[in-house]
Design a protein with these regions (language model features):
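Structural detector of well-ordered beta-strand residues that form the stable sheet scaffold
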Residues: 29, 79, 101-103, 131, ...
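ATP-binding N-terminal substructure of ATP-dependent carboxylate-amine bond-forming enzymes
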Residues: 1-125, 138-146
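Structural signal for short hydrophobic segments within the conserved structured cores
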Residues: 47-49, 111, 129-137, 168-169, ...
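Short, solvent-exposed coil/turn elements at secondary-structure transition points
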Residues: 34, 54, 108, 136-139, ...
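Acidic/histidine-enriched active-site and ligand-binding environments that engage anionic O-linkages
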Residues: 147-156
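ATP-dependent carboxylate activation and anion-phosphoryl transfer catalytic cores
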Residues: 7-24, 48, 71-73, 96, ...
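A short, flexible low-complexity segment enriched in Lys/Arg and Gly/Pro that occurs
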Residues: 135-148, 241, 314
Length: 455
């Protein structure tokens, strides 16, 4: 087991990793920007090193500064968390070159699964169903028109090297394709340095289902069930739950087995997530992409499976084999996560940085967890993602979990900044959400228009 690890991240995920490491008896090193000097993760870690100014490009994305901090503090491994450098194969390679273990998959696997075109080809080889679409990269609007004509409208344009909802456009008809292609390609070029696109047929109505996997260095792979992440705004998740009420036992076994095949086919190591689209009309599921890191929503899986995913990441990276077999994984109850963001729903969810003057995080009762890194008097910097907390609940069944989440959101108090807490409470209280009557289009096309009219 490692003696000391460095956490190359900030916010609640850095705090989450520090806590897991401490419970394993491992010393921790936090890195921080000048904007995060008073951040909670710097106070909880055994050591803290400043790596640059507030802008992420000069600090949390500064590979040389992070590796220098790791060498200086004699850290044996680096946990990248999510976002920032977590899926950067160059960073993983450079860690290896200086003799520091990257807590995640190899750079080779990141390159294969991080490129949507390569990942699609790999899944076809592994007998994992893929969405009908282009066979490779599409570089011009003319090529896109030809592919769309072949697979049929509506289509989804996606950046080959994309993620986080960037470089994605839904196109309903041929007349709109050229403009959408040019906009999405430019966005992809600006965000990822690669303007190549690919096309997929739109699956509608659909559920966004993702499967959590764990893989050790000996080639053993298991899955921990699925998460339903269908409630999304601008292709970014708002609320997640596990298990999905849209999936029965037979389909759960099939989609879990497909996720394991996907991971095995590339020699995957550590925690990862395979994302699928479930066609509710036919019951068929299709591979979308693989996230080669821990997910924001990993706590819902931890609640229903009883497995500490972050601890397993550290154990696997240290060379320990998985102690769990697939038959050991029994999902119990139902878990839901709501993301609490410093943003203003009344102004198109504009970020709301500032100083938190008063804070009460819900607590009490069985099956309630709040992952956060904020405290009274803390100033939210304007440079980073707006998420400030995650509320996660676990109940005997879905209704129990929904009621518990409503109670938790009702108790939550954050003053000094505007948050989406009331929006989340309205969403979780909506009769259609309570009934499970929603798909990936529900939030944007059904719930939000009426919500904004009400506001």
């Amino acid at each position: 087991m490692f003696r000391k690890i460095l956490i190359a991240n900030r916010g609640e995920i850095a705090v989450r990793i520090i806590r897991a490491a401490r419970e394993l008896g491992i010393a921790t090193v936090a890195v921080y920007s000048t904007a995060d000097k008073e951040a909670l993760h710097t106070l909880l870690a055994d050591e803290a090193i400043c790596i640059g100014p507030g802008k992420a490009t000069e600090s949390y994305l500064n590979i040389n500064a992070i590796l220098s901090a790791a060498v200086l503090t004699e850290a044996e491994a680096i946990h990248p968390g999510f976002g920032f450098l977590s899926e950067n194969s160059k960073f993983a390679t450079m860690c290896e070159e200086v003799g520091i273990k990257f807590i995640g998959p190899s750079a080779r696997v990141m390159d294969v699964m991080g490129d949507k075109i390569n990942a699609r080809a790999q899944m076809i080889k592994a007998n994992v169903p893929v969405i009908p679409g282009s066979d490779g990269e599409v570089h011009t609007a003319e090529e896109a028109l030809a592919v769309a004509e072949k697979i049929g409208y509506p289509v989804m344009l996606k950046a080959s090297a994309g993620g986080g909802g960037k470089g994605i456009r839904k196109v309903e008809k041929a007349e709109a394709l050229v403009s959408a292609f040019e906009t999405a390609s430019s966005e992809a070029k600006a965000n990822f340095g690669n303007g190549a696109m690919y096309l997929e047929r739109v699956i509608y109505p659909a559920r966004h289902i993702e499967v959590q996997i764990l893989a050790d260095q000996m080639g053993h792979v298991i899955h921990l069930g699925e998460r339903d992440c269908s409630l999304q705004r601008n292709n970014q998740k708002v609320l997640e739950e596990s298990p999905s009420i849209a999936i029965g036992k037979t389909l759960r076994n099939e989609i879990g087995a497909a996720a394991v095949r996907a991971a095995e086919s590339v020699g995957y190591e550590n925690a990862g997530t395979i994302e699928f689209l479930l066609d509710e009309a036919t019951g068929k599921f299709y591979f979308m992409e693989m996230n080669t890191r821990v997910q924001v929503e990993h706590p819902v899986t931890e609640f229903v499976s009883g497995v500490d995913i972050v601890k397993e990441q550290i154990r696997i990276a240290s060379g320990q084999p998985l102690t769990l077999k697939q038959e050991d994984i029994v999902l119990k109850g139902h878990a839901i996560e709501c993301r609490i963001n410093a943003e203003n729903p009344a102004f198109n969810f504009a970020p709301s940085p500032g100083k938190i003057t008063n804070l009460y995080l819900p607590s009490g009762g069985v099956g309630l967890r709040v992952d956060s890194a904020v405290y009274p008097g803390y100033t939210i910097p304007p440079y980073y993602d707006s998420m400030i907390a995650k509320i996660i609940v676990h109940g005997e069944n879905r209704f129990d979990a929904l009621m518990k989440m409503q109670r938790a959101l009702y108790e939550l108090e954050i003053e000094g900044v505007v948050t989406n807490a009331d929006f989340q409470l309205d969403l979780i209280s909506d009769r259609r959400v309570i009934a499970g009557d929603y798909d990936t289009s529900f939030l944007m096309e059904t719930f939000l228009p009426h919500y904004q009219e009400k506001e």
